[in-house]
Every structure is written in C-alpha cells, then in structure tokens.
Amino acid sequence: MSKTRRSPIAAAPIVLISLLVLPVAAGLWATMSPVLRPISGQDQGAFMSLWSWNGLWPAMRLSLVTGLAATLIGLAITAALFALFQGHRIFRVFLRLVAPFLAVPHATAALALTFILAPSGWIMRGVVTLFNALGIPISQTPPDFITINDPGGLALIFGLVIKEVPFLVLMCVAAWGQCDAPRRRLVASALGYGRITGFWLTIWPVLYPQLRLPIFAVLAYSMTTVDMAMILGPSLPPSLAVQISKWITLPEPLYQGMAAAAAVVQLTLVAAMLLVWRFLELMGRAISRAQFQNGIRGSSLDGPIKFFGLVFGLVGFG
C-alpha cells in the first residue's frame, strides 16, 4: 500500500506561525536580557530601580485610564452611529469621509487638535473675534486653564477617540454584511422594539464577535501610543510608553535596564486589560440577556442616543 503524500501546502500554517512567532520571541528575549542581568555599577536590579521611580504608578494609571476610556467611548460612538444611521443618507456621507481621515497619521491629527484646542488656538481666537465683532469687550490674553497636556489625559483621550472611531467604523462596515442586519432589524421592529433596543438585542450580539480583534488592537494601541501621548498627554509624569521611549534613548545602563523593565510592565498591563475587557464582555452579555427577558421595548431611548450619535459623529468626521 502506497503512503499518501502530504501536500507542501499543509505545512504553510506552521511556517507562517513560525515567521510570526520567532521575531516576537527574539524581541522578547532582547527586552528581557537587560532585566535579567545585573546593572553595572548599581546595587539593585532593573525592576527594583523601576519600582523606586516615583512616577511609576501615575504613569501606569494614566496608561490604563486613557486606553480603556478611549476604547469604550470610541466603541460607543461607533455602535450609536450604526444603530441610528446605518442605511440613511447621512451615513453614506460619513463613509465617504472615513477613508481619507483614516489615512491621516496619528501625530498629524494630534498636532491639528493642538492648534484647535489650545488656550490660544483657533477656537479661542474665533471666540475673541466674534466678541470683538459684536462690540463685547473681552480679554486678548489666552485663558488660564489647561486644555492640552492636562494631568488627567482628557485631551489624549479625545484625540484617540477622534482617530480610532473611523477605524472601528470601517471594521463595522466590513462585518455588517455578514450579520443579516436588515432581516434582524425588521423582526425586532415587528416585535415592537425601538431602533436602539432592536439593534442592541438582535444585531450587536452577532456584530461584536467580528469586531473583537480590532477592538483589542485599539485598546492595545491606546495604552501604548507614544506620538499622540507626547503631543496631547501630560508630561509630569508622562504615560508609561512615553517614559520608556525616553529611557531607551539614554546611553546609561541604568536607564536601559529600567526601560526594559518598564516594557515588561507595559506588556503585562496590556495583557491584563485585555482580560478585563473580556470580563466586561461577559457582563454585557448577562445584562443584554436580562434586558431581552424583561420585555421592555425601549423605544424612548432612540431620541437621546440619536442626538449623542449625531453630535459625536459630526465631531469625529468633521
């Protein structure tokens, strides 16, 4: 009996996985090696030096808060846009603006927001010009409040949301055709559910699993961004990713080791936050199931959420 010859194509997945895993493993080893060996001229290792840095916990908190908040807000805006405007003429206008805005680099978008939101930016200049035209006296000095580089990272969250919503919208467009959304929406409407509640109970459970990996990518990027955090985020202390980029450029072995240790901490934070997000998914599934069983149609939610989706949609694509 002749043996069945295996096609070379059968080994393609193994080769592809190896090509992806080996560079990552080499990078992890290069990152871990400064952490594992003692730092020359120092009595303590890289991790102990990192723990002794006073800005570690604020930097970690800033990375966690900005990453999670930007992802949640961006996903909520995307879901509201699809729940309310998918199939409408205004939604087609949104889609025409997605691709060009998606091509804008993150640093460019952050600089544009700086020119707009700064205390001496275009918004405040426009307000001053308007008041002067109306004959209302107003100070020419920029207001004494922080809009960029605020300690809470609100400007960074806003910039991340503006940049990531088009990406999530594009991912939803790619997955929308596989959800049989028109039929599901028709059935929900026939059962008396409002547009928002019907979308939440019938379309979103099918659409969301196809968005999980893009959402994870947005969450990981929002926690580890360097360029946008340097422009929009606080600097004393900065986010953990920005501090790593500063340490890695210094020639001293101490800072090289601290950068490697901080990179390991950053990787752990991202992995932990992905697990937290998965837990939030399970909670959301339980809430949706309870809402589905209580029989409340929820059509009264359409008005407020329509306003929310329209306002933030215009901000995101304008």
What are these regions, as identified by a protein language model?
Residues R6-I39, W53-G177, V206, Q210-D227, ...:
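Membrane-water interface segments at the C-terminal ends of transmembrane alpha-helices
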Residues R37, S49, L95, A99, ...:
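Short amphipathic alpha-helical coupling elements at transmembrane boundaries
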Residues Q42-W53:
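A short amphipathic helical element positioned immediately N-terminal to and/or at the very start
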Residues R92, R185-A188, L254-A260:
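Loop-to-transmembrane helix entry/capping segments in MFS-fold secondary transporters
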Residues G177-P182, L186-L207:
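Short helix-to-coil transition segments within interhelical loops
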Residues D227-L254:
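Glycine-rich helix-loop "coupling/hinge" segments at transmembrane-helix boundaries
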Residues L280-G309:
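Flexible interhelical linker loops that connect adjacent transmembrane helices
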